[in-house]
Amino acid sequence: MSQPKMKDADYALLANFRATLRTFIAFSESQARSVGLTPQQHQALLTIRGSGAATATVGYVAGRLILKPHSASGLISRLEEAGLITREADAADQRRMALKLTPQAEGLLEALSLAHIEELKTLKPLLVNLVDDFGG
């Protein structure tokens, strides 16, 4: 059985979806820079804060941001030098260092996250329509 061929509308849908994602990414990068963070630093802070039950470690950040361990280590060191994170021995495994946000980072991340949620609310109708169209 052969796969169905792509139609012009399929290409347009994918192009529109990617353009919408790029719009959000550009917004996110601009917001991060407006508070003195690089986009990657913002992503790392969000990854650490959003780790939930998982212990945020350098390896965890590397995996979530799709970075090589040495790149993640450098990123974490720069965040620590900037006073945005601390490293603490993990209560469950003293060999691991758990990453924690400082109060300064918590404030920055909360402001950024609120702005991102508002932007997503704005983009939601477009994203929902695009995703719904994939099924059609």
What does each of the following model-derived ranges do?
Residues 1-35, 82-84:
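N-terminal leader segment of winged-helix/HTH proteins
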Residues 18-21, 25, 65, 109, ...:
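Amphipathic, non-transmembrane alpha-helical scaffold segments
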Residues 26-68:
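N-terminal helix-turn-helix DNA-binding core of bacterial DNA-binding proteins
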